Every structure is written in structure tokens, then in C-alpha cells.
């Protein structure tokens, strides 16, 4: 029994207005080749399939065309797809009746029955190519406050926060019931959350737990679970001795992820081997200048000149993040960058300009607002931020905005 675990596709993402559709098409094609080459029996997608709560029609077509293609290539392939915090949970489930006929299980929301979580829906048997059940997967969507019975925000259970305690209780009860059904078969869980000890991507992953808890310890997942396939953290990594695994995102979703070894995770139940990371090719380069820290404008311009860039349209070119240290007025920096980038097949994904602390004037004592004007305050703030006086167009725009207040 061979299971492939992936997560955090973020279909529909844009960077500074640039579409990433071509990258998602390339990844989904690569994934299809891996499914066939590795003779995968089941594909687990642990949340954040889409990048936003209102995915475009094209983003949805891209997803469903890929799923249909995988099943067409291997009619016995089983696919289990759960929601993440970015996903529109109910919209994800809308075509469930059709997808179920293709062997695709979609869990966007938590379903309950009289005895707790509805295991007829959330516990899914995984079959090998001979049709024999070889494992059971407990598929958990992204959990919200209402999904945690007994949650009392602000309360603490011993040394644990309220959310951790409520999640631990939910998993203990549910996994015990699921394990009784699984018997001697391996029991696998899917979830979308942050585990303590996991390495996060700066600025890329929202802190999604409630009630003040940011992360839960890996031991909230009971020992009866042979493997836990997680989504949310974009760096591929293992916790709890390898039992708890983040597959990571398929390619960089922000500048902080440029150095990651993106890929998918293969779990071979028959061989009993540790989960295996399968690297994915990077569809489009993502660059950061400088690689670390910041640099002044002349160094950035020189680095741009040294880049060996592919001969392709800008809309297909590498993504670029720039981190500058201001050595002149910001308006001069942006004008110089605009001129330099105009001739290069690069897509500017992000720009930060910081001023050295030594260049910042000492904080002035608070002004008596009865002795100044809004325009004078605007001009002072503009000087502090840009190192130069506001131009007439800046003052005109400020006056227009002020007149609307």
C-alpha cells in the first residue's frame, strides 16, 4: 500500500498581481507523473488547496481537471482531500456527490453524529490495487471553534491551553473509536494545524488557532495513529520521531521559502520504511536580492546586471524580491528600480526599503496639536519616511483626502 501525502497547494495565489497559474499547472502535471511512477494507491491532500475563500472559476477548473486526470490515469486511485484555513469549506464540498463516484473524498467541514464525529464520513478505508483494505484514514478538515466540544476560552486544563485540551479530548475519543474499527490495520490521520516544534515560514502562514493557543504539541495525536499527515506549515519536516509529518508546499509561496526543499511525501505501508521525501522541480525561479539582509541601491543594481536570466516574456520570468537599505530619498530609489527592471524579464513580487536607524532623526517631543495643522503633520511624516520634502502632487493628494474626512 503506497500513499502520497501533499498539502498547501494554494491554487489561485498571485504575487504582487502576477498569476501563478502556470506554476500550478506544472506542479499538477509533475504530481500526476509521480503518482504513476511510484504506483501510488492513495493521494492525501491535507488542506489549503485554494489560496482564498473565493477561488476563481479558473482555479476550480484547474483543481478538478487535475483530479479527473489522476483518476483517468489510474481508475483505482483513491483521493482524500481536506480543507485548510484558506479554503472555502462548503464550496469545496459542493461537488462531493460527483467526486465520490470517481473515488475522491472531500472533507470541508466536520460532521457529527449522536456518538461524536461521524466516522461513516470521516473514516475512509484505503484499498490496494487488489481491492483489499490495507489502512484507514481519519480525515479531519480545518477545525474551527464550534468543532471543539467543551471548549472554554480563557480556561486552562492543568498546564495546557483551552484549545489544546479540547483538541486532545476530541482526538482521544475519536481515535479510540476509529482504532476499534481499524483493528490491526494502520490508522492514519489528516489535519491542518500548527504543531509545536514545527519550523514556520516568516509572513507566509497565518497563526490559525483560537483562544490564545498558537500551536499544539504533537502528542495530542494518540499513539494509536501510525502516521499523521499534516498541512499548514510550508517547509517539509517531521515531528515526533517521524510519525507526524508536514509534506510542505509544492513550491515557494513567499520569499521566506526560497531555500526550502519542496516536495511530496511517500508512505509505503508494505515496506514499513520511514516516509520518503520526493523533491519537486521548481517551475519558475524565485530570487531575493540580496540573499540575506538588505543592500543599498548601487549594490542592488549591480546584482541585477549580473543575473543570468532566461529569454522569455516577463509574464513567465522569475519572481524577484528586493530588500533595500535607503541611502537616498525613496522616490529616487523607486525611480531607479523601475528603470532597471523595465528592461529585464523579471516579475517584482515584493519590495522593502528600510532606513538605517542612525539615519532616523531623534524622536521629537510630542507636538501641541492646537499649534500645528494636519498638512504640517503630513509633511513631517513624509520627511521622516522618505528623507525629502513632499512635492506639490503629494500635498494635493493629501488635501483631497483630508477634504473627504
Swiss-Prot record:
GO terms for biological process: DNA metabolic process. Transmembrane segments: none annotated. Coiled coil: none annotated. It comes from the Bacteria. InterPro entries: Calcineurin-like_PHP_ApaH, DNA_Repair-Maintenance_Comp, Metallo-depent_PP-like, Mre11_N, SbcD, SbcD_C. Keywords: Exonuclease, Hydrolase, Nuclease. One of its GO terms (molecular function) is 3'-5' exonuclease activity. Pfam families: Metallophos, SbcD_C. SbcCD cleaves DNA hairpin structures. These structures can inhibit DNA replication and are intermediates in certain DNA recombination reactions. The complex acts as a 3'->5' double strand exonuclease that can open hairpins. It also has a 5' single-strand endonuclease activity. Belongs to the SbcD family. Heterodimer of SbcC and SbcD. This is Nuclease SbcCD subunit D. It comes from Rhodobacter capsulatus (strain ATCC BAA-309 / NBRC 16581 / SB1003). The lineage of its organism: Bacteria, Pseudomonadati, Pseudomonadota, Alphaproteobacteria, Rhodobacterales. The gene is sbcD.
Amino acid at each position: 500500500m503506497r500513499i502520497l501525502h501533499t498539502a498547501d497547494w494554494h491554487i489561485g495565489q498571485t504575487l504582487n498581481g502576477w498569476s501563478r497559474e502556470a506554476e500550478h499547472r506544472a506542479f499538477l502535471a509533475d504530481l500526476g507523473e509521480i503518482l504513476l511512477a511510484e504506483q501510488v494507491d492513495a493521494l492525501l491532500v491535507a488542506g489549503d488547496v485554494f489560496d482564498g475563500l473565493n477561488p476563481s472559476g479558473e482555479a476550480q477548473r484547474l483543481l478538478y481537471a487535475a483530479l479527473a486526470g489522476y483518476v483517468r490515469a489510474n481508475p483505482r486511485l483513491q483521493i482524500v482531500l481536506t480543507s485548510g484555513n484558506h479554503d472555502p469549506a462548503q464550496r469545496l464540498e459542493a461537488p462531493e456527490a460527483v467526486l465520490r463516484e470517481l473515488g475522491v473524498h472531500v472533507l470541508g467541514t466536520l460532521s457529527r453524529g449522536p456518538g461524536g464525529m461521524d466516522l461513516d464520513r470521516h473514516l475512509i478505508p484505503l484499498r490496494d490495487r487488489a481491492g483489499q483494505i490495507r489502512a484507514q484514514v481519519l480525515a479531519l478538515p480545518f477545525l474551527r471553534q464550534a468543532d471543539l466540544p467543551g471548549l472554554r476560552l480563557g480556561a486552562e486544563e492543568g498546564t495546557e491551553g483551552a484549545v489544546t485540551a479540547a483538541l486532545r479530548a476530541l482526538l482521544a475519543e475519536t481515535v479510540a473509536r476509529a482504532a476499534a474499527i481499524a483493528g490491526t490495520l494502520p490508522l492514519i490521520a489528516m489535519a491542518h494545524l500548527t504543531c509545536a516544534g514545527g519550523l514556520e515560514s516568516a509572513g507566509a502562514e497565518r497563526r490559525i488557532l483560537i483562544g490564545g493557543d498558537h500551536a499544539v504539541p504533537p502528542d495530542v495525536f494518540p499513539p494509536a495513529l501510525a502516521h499523521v499527515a499534516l498541512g499548514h506549515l510550508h517547509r517539509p519536516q517531521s515531528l515526533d520521531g517521524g510519525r507526524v509529518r508536514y509534506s510542505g508546499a509544492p513550491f515557494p509561496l513567499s520569499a521566506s521559502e526560497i531555500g526550502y526543499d519542496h516536495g511530496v511525501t511517500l508512505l509505503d505501508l508494505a515496506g514499513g520504511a520511514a516516509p520518503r521525501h520526493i523533491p519537486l522541480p521548481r517551475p519558475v525561479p524565485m530570487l531575493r536580492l540580496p540573499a540575506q539582509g538588505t543592500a543599498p541601491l548601487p549594490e542592488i543594481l549591480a546584482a541585477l546586471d549580473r543575473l543570468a536570466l532566461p529569454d522569455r516574456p516577463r509574464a513567465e520570468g522569475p519572481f524577484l524580491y528586493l530588500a533595500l537599505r535607503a541611502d537616498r530619498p525613496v522616490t529616487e530609489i523607486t525611480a531607479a528600480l523601475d528603470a532597471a527592471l523595465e528592461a529585464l524579464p523579471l516579475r517584482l513580487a515584493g519590495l522593502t526599503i528600510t532606513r538605517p536607524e542612525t539615519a532616523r532623526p531623534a524622536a521629537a517631543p510630542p507636538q501641541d496639536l492646537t499649534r500645528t495643522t494636519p498638512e504640517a503633520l503630513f509633511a513631517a511624516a513624509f520627511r521622516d519616511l522618505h528623507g525629502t520634502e513632499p512635492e506639490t502632487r503629494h500635498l494635493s493628494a493629501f488635501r483631497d483626502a483630508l477634504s473627504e474626512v
